[in-house]
């Protein structure tokens, strides 16, 4: 599912730009640096993970089983460059309307344009933040990350039995993107979170806390904590 705003973004072009940023950032950060919001991962684990996801997604988009990459050790720059290029080349060759396997069943290959854009964006934030480096991405792109959590990821988690339905929706208001979402269904929200689109996206992906600067919580804080304590995303 995509909104009209999501459909207006050139996801494949943006994916390529963020992949390039990720690639050029790899040598700037010590591979042993901890990535604390990703459990016990260090930067080398993050890079290998995203490379593997790109490789796997290329297989899903083309409906073929990918060849395993093996255990390594890997040259991180070479590995990521190869897998990023493979994904872009695959998606470009297929075109947006080619039939593909997606996270929500059969669908168009364009699903992976969007999914891999947001996978890359969140992990680019991980990489650059772990290295103490800034990241400047348009609020409209971050808003689409929020939209994917609300319209694709959370409903999928619920459908797969990975989380129970929320008792009441959570309203998310992006002050810099002019957009509002209801996380967890329709109806009167129990609580509203107002913030920039980046902070809302990172909240949904477990990189931000409601107590962080820049997030305003109005309503039932316990309901928000309950929602965030569930598996909203894979």
Which ranges hold each PLM region?
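Actinobacteria-biased recognition of intrinsically disordered, low-complexity terminal regions
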Residues: 1-16, 24-27, 230-234
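Soluble acyl-CoA-dependent acyltransferase catalytic core bearing the H(X)4D motif
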Residues: 2-14, 52, 57, 70, ...
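Hydrophobic packing residues in well-ordered alpha-helices of helical domains and bundles
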Residues: 11-15, 73-80, 113-116, 120, ...
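Short, contiguous alpha-helical
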Residues: 20, 30-66, 104-160, 200
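Hydrophobic/aromatic-rich structural module bridging two neighboring secondary-structure elements via a short loop
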Residues: 59-113
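Short, mixed-charge aromatic SLiMs
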Residues: 71-82, 140-156, 220-232
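Hydrophobic protein-protein interaction segments
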Residues: 138-185, 192-193
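C-terminal interaction segments
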Residues: 189-234
